[in-house]
Swiss-Prot record:
Keywords: Carbohydrate metabolism, Cellulose degradation, Glycoprotein, Hydrolase, Polysaccharide degradation, Secreted, Serine esterase, Signal. It is an enzyme of class 3 (hydrolase). Gene3D superfamilies: alpha/beta hydrolase. The lineage of its organism: Eukaryota, Fungi, Dikarya, Ascomycota, Pezizomycotina. Belongs to the carbohydrate esterase 1 (CE1) family. AxeA subfamily. It comes from Aspergillus clavatus (strain ATCC 1007 / CBS 513.65 / DSM 816 / NCTC 3887 / NRRL 1 / QM 1276 / 107). This is Probable acetylxylan esterase A.
Length: 308
């Protein structure tokens, strides 16, 4: 029996060692924690969008995800450095995905049919695949996936909420336009739309809701709660876009846009006005603030449910 016992011990050791090697190799494939890392193999990437990720040293078990989307002329690294999300990730344990636009001016494609359609093969599709990769690799909490962005990234935030409403629990929009407002009649990618930018694309809540819902035909499930920021002195994306964005989501959620539940002046700070239509929609209008409204990380954490 001794030879058999020896062989059994050797076999168990070999299997154990092999498992350790496989585990080590698997871990090595994951981005290093505590710094911004590029991911190049996240899956189908129809528009060659760059993926960068920040995994905190203090990663929670079953962590949440925030997708943080940069502005025109920006990069993933610039938004990583200029926004508070990586620092907040260390405090709350979530993962941050920083997509990077593939276009020369670094604006996002919020204009083509592909990007304005669920699984349509545009920028929105690439970003959604980044989220799916992260969920699979890190076993994240699928009920705690959020999206936010500034300027062009705010536009894409609205688009992501409309094209993938089943993916996100909430979104925060810093100085954007309504989803579909930049739609290109010639189906151009990342097209600029001066009519929309200047606040001249005006519609009813019902019409805007139709635009948003058409981005995922047939979908009738839950949609992300939306918080909309805009400044009264914005000369890039004119202030009327605040009204149109709020009208869009009020229409989507079935709120009466003209009868909000509450209007609070000087909240969350002086010269800001917070309008709440219901638990799914809140707008914050900043008097005297230009483009873009500064990110309020603590309020974002409260809206996303990471903090009270």
């Amino acid at each position: 029996m001794a030879p058999f016992s020896f062989l059994l011990t050797l076999l168990l050791y070999t299997l154990s060692a092999g498992a350790s090697v496989l585990e080590s190799r698997s871990s090595a494939l994951l981005p290093r924690a505590g710094s911004l890392q590029q991911v190049t193999n996240f899956g189908d990437n129809p528009t060659n969008v760059g993926m960068y990720i920040y995994v905190p040293n203090n990663l929670a078990s079953n962590p949440g995800i925030i997708v943080a989307i940069h502005y025109c002329t920006g990069t993933a690294e610039a938004y990583y450095n200029g926004s508070p999300y990586a620092k907040l990730a260390e405090k709350h344990g979530f993962i941050v995905i920083y997509p990077e636009s593939p276009y020369q001016g670094k604006c996002w494609d919020v204009s083509s049919r592909a990007s304005l359609t669920h699984n349509g093969g545009g920028n929105s599709n690439s970003i959604a695949n980044m989220v799916k990769w992260t969920i699979k690799k890190y076993k994240t909490n699928t009920s705690k996936v959020f999206v936010t962005g500034s300027s062009s990234g705010a536009m894409m935030t609205n688009v992501m909420a409309a094209t993938y409403p089943d993916m996100f629990a909430a979104g925060v929009v810093y100085s954007g336009v309504a989803a579909g407002c930049f739609m290109s009649n010639t189906n151009q990618q990342a097209a600029w739309n001066s009519t929309c930018a200047h606040g001249k694309s005006i519609a009813t809540p019902e019409a805007w809701a139709h635009v948003a819902k058409a981005m995922y035909p047939g979908y009738d499930g839950p949609r992300p709660r939306m918080q909309i920021y805009h400044g009264s002195a914005d000369t890039t994306l004119y202030p009327q876009n605040y009204q149109e964005t709020c009208k869009e989501w009020a229409g989507v959620f079935g709120y009466d846009y003209n009868a909000p539940r509450s209007v609070e002046n000087n909240k969350p700070q002086a010269n800001y006005k917070t309008t709440t239509w219901g638990k799914e929609l809140q707008g914050i209008y900043a008097t005297g603030v230009g483009h873009t409204v500064p990110i309020n990380g603590d309020r974002d954490m409260a809206w996303f449910g990471f903090a009270k």
